[in-house]
Regions:
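Secretory targeting and sorting signals
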Residues: 1-18
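Contiguous segments within soluble domain cores/interaction surfaces
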Residues: 19-159, 169-170, 174-184
Length: 184
């Protein structure tokens, strides 16, 4: 009986070093390439497998391979940032809608930076933006939302025009999405 109790306890115990933070496993090393200043920006294309008109997300068409897509506004891989009228300072930004296909049900972690310069990219926040965006297992709802899909709006904030990339990490994937930004 004692051996069975010990084995049961070991089976339920977490491995050494396992984190209580459910987001820790999504904090993979960033694999965002650096570009030389003036190099062509390898913008991620719109995923044509998705009927973006029917899905009706704020932000138009999603770019990248999925299962998580940013809707940057318009129909492609360009984001127009506006001055930060709410908090002021050097950051500019705008609304981006993040669409999650019904085929993926887990958490999502998004981080990014400028690829052709030293500037960072942030999300939401106040005077200073947050360094990452977390998409939980719940969603806002919208007209045309496919059953089982999720999505959240966020503010994406930058300090300069250029070529930017975000790394989108889920439990079963890691994707990079690249887009251009025009900032004031």
């Amino acid at each position: 009986m004692t051996v069975v109790s010990v084995l049961a306890t070991l089976a339920l115990a977490q491995p050494l070093g396992a984190s209580q933070n459910p987001w820790a496993t999504l904090h993979r090393p960033l694999h965002l390439s650096r570009l030389a200043p003036g190099a062509a920006c390898p913008v991620s294309p719109v995923d044509r497998r998705i009927d973006w008109t029917r899905i009706n997300i704020f932000g138009g068409s999603g770019i990248g391979r999925g299962p998580v897509y940013p809707g940057l506004g318009g129909s492609g891989g360009h984001f127009d940032a506006r001055p930060d009228d709410q908090y002021g300072g050097p950051w500019a930004g705008g609304k981006v809608f993040w669409y999650v296909r019904p085929s993926y049900r887990g958490r999502v972690l998004i981080r990014g930076r400028r690829l052709d310069g030293p500037q960072s990219l942030g999300f939401n926040g106040r005077v200073l933006p947050d360094r990452e965006l977390r998409i939980h297992n719940y969603s806002v709802s919208w007209s045309g939302q496919p059953s089982g899909s999720r999505g959240i709006p966020s503010s994406v904030r930058v300090r300069a025009s250029g070529c930017y990339g975000v790394q989108i990490d889920g439990s079963t994937f890691s994707r990079v999405v690249v887009f251009t930004v025009t900032a004031p």
